[in-house]
Amino acid sequence: MILKSQDVLVLAKLVVIGGDEWSYGRMATTLWMSPSEVHAGVKRLIKARLASDQQNRITPNVRNLESFLLHGLPYVFVPDLGEITRGMPTSYAGPVLSPFFQAGEDLPPVWPDPDGEVRGQSFSPLYKSVPKAAREDEWLYELLSLIDAIRGGRARERQMAYGEIKKRMGLNAGS
């Protein structure tokens, strides 16, 4: 079993959903994926112990997720930084961390997106549909941009992103 980058997108959506009911079809629509991709991703997440299936209710395993984000994600899903493009700001330039970090001379990291309004350096999203899914779900956008700060940020950015994610997961942990 090999975890795929789109599985992290599915896991992020599970965190956002919290204890609310969901279906594979509805999640697939909101993530711009096929239901079979979502289903396969959930199976891999359960096998990797990043999610659990209790009484036909699939939820994130918060402890394991925290450990994976800090100790696994930055080494497994390293982002590709590329050319200058238009897109959606992510990582330290995303909606949560941008107030704490000055842009300086560097262009902000962005997910390439033809509808993007910011010019920056291309930062590969976890999955091709991330910009579309993030545009439709602000909480998901915030979480994915924090995950990107862990994937490709500097030490201070990673530390701050990890703290923000822990706070947010704490809000949904008991849901």
Regions found by a protein language model. Name each.
Residues 1-17:
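Short alpha-helical segments that sit at the start of domains
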Residues 19-31:
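Short acidic, hydrophobic short linear motifs in intrinsically disordered regions
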Residues 30-33, 55:
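Recognition helix of helix-turn-helix/homeodomain-like DNA-binding domains
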Residues 32-47:
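Short amphipathic alpha-helical interaction segments
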Residues 46-58:
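A short, conserved structural fragment
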Residues 56-86:
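Intrinsically disordered, low-complexity basic tails/linkers immediately adjacent to helix-turn-helix/homeobox/MYB/SANT
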Residues 76-163:
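Exposed, interaction-prone assembly regions rather than primary DNA-binding/catalytic cores
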Residues 164-175:
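N-terminal, charged low-complexity regulatory/assembly segments
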